């Protein structure tokens, strides 16, 4: 199977629709496929003066949705697998979900409850993927009691909001304080404890630039890169997520791929992991508890490299002046042109991009050229 990468959570707003082409071109440069998630909400002021997020006017939403439809059809005709989608929040009682469609013919619906949303798209190839699930119940955290495995085959548990796997892990959810801290009541582990078969991914929840490297991304194990094959893989939960750099992960139980259902009992588990940096360990959880651990640290650090031995080396190149705005206050944008040549062979190049204005070109077996743009403040907050 092919490993195809995407950002499943790129929210383009009404006031950004004139940038739609820019969003699409950036996504095509870094992603194997792209489900766009139109964001039909705006901030309004209540009578008390407090800010409140509500739906945009219906005519604006409808106009934008047709622009998205037209663009997706155009990109599909060019051979790139792009999906139509939008964010649904309802009344907040069931959690936020991104709704995606296999075809490009569906309307956008805004019912108040998750079960109503599911009914709206009965007999339609549609999925609704919950995100930042660990916020408070009835305050945009996930309501696992209403969850449907077929309609929502997996959940987004890491993004720019932080990590929703549980409420005790090292990756917190303190970036958006107005949405509250994460809770154990609604986190991903509660869904598993309820017996739900739900996969997990990471994706950005990006509102300025799609596919922000530092906000996570999703991998799909598909037969090929057609929309139909990708859709089948997502429905079958052959998905995983990474919080930053991409990882090549293979995982089977009795030869069945991730996302499969096997009966309880004794089984053979096999996995293979290739990462962008040294792997410390692989943890195997059972019933949300650490059951086994494969420790890699200490198995390679002291091994001597032979004089004639050929090795693979991976390194990161970073440009800019750092996240501190006290320095070079007037230099909002900086452009960099460079090249890289190695004595051996370039095995692969990962585009670790957080903003627009990046280009990789003239890539050969042992060299490449690049144009990078750095900003005083990027989409990842740095």
Where are these regions (language model features)?
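Extended, charged catalytic domains and RNA/DNA-binding interfaces, predominantly
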Residues: 1-382
């Amino acid at each position: 199977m092919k490993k195809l990468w995407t950002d499943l959570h790129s929210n383009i707003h009404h006031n950004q629709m004139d940038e739609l082409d820019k969003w699409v071109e950036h996504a095509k440069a870094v992603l194997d496929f792209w489900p766009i998630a139109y964001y039909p909400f705006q901030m309004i002021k209540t009578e008390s003066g407090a800010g409140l997020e509500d739906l945009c006017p219906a005519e604006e939403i409808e106009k934008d949705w047709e622009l998205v439809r037209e663009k997706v059809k155009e990109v599909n005709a060019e051979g790139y697998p792009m999906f139509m989608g939008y964010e649904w929040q309802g009344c907040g009682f069931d959690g936020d979900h991104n709704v995606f469609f296999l075809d490009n013919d569906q309307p956008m619906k805004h019912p108040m409850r998750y079960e109503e949303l599911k009914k709206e798209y009965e007999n339609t190839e549609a999925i609704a993927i919950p995100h930042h699930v660990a916020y408070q119940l009835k305050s945009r955290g996930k309501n696992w009691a209403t969850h449907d495995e077929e309609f929502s085959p997996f959940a987004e548990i890491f993004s720019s909001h932080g990590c929703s796997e549980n409420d005790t892990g090292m990756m917190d959810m303190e970036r958006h304080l107005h949405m509250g801290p994460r809770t154990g009541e609604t986190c991903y582990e509660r869904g598993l404890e309820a017996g739900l078969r739900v996969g997990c991914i990471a994706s950005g929840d990006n509102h300025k630039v799609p596919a922000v490297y530092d906000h996570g991304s999703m991998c799909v194990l598909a037969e090929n890169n057609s929309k139909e094959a990708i859709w089948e893989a997502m429905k079958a939960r052959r998905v995983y997520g990474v919080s930053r750099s991409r990882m090549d992960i293979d995982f089977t139980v009795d030869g069945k791929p991730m996302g499969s259902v096997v009966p309880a009992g004794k089984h053979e588990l096999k996995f293979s992991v290739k990462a962008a940096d040294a792997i410390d360990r692989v943890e195997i959880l059972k019933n949300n508890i650490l059951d086994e651990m494969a420790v890699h640290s200490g198995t390679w650090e002291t091994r001597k490299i032979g004089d004639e031995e050929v090795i693979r080396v991976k390194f990161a190149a970073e440009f800019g002046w750092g996240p501190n705005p006290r320095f070079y206050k007037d230099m909002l944008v900086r452009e960099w042109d460079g090249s890289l040549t190695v004595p051996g062979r370039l095995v692969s190049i990962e585009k670790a991009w957080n903003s627009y204005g990046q280009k990789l070109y003239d890539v050969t077996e042992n060299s490449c050229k690049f144009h990078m743009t750095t900003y005083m403040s990027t989409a990842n907050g740095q």
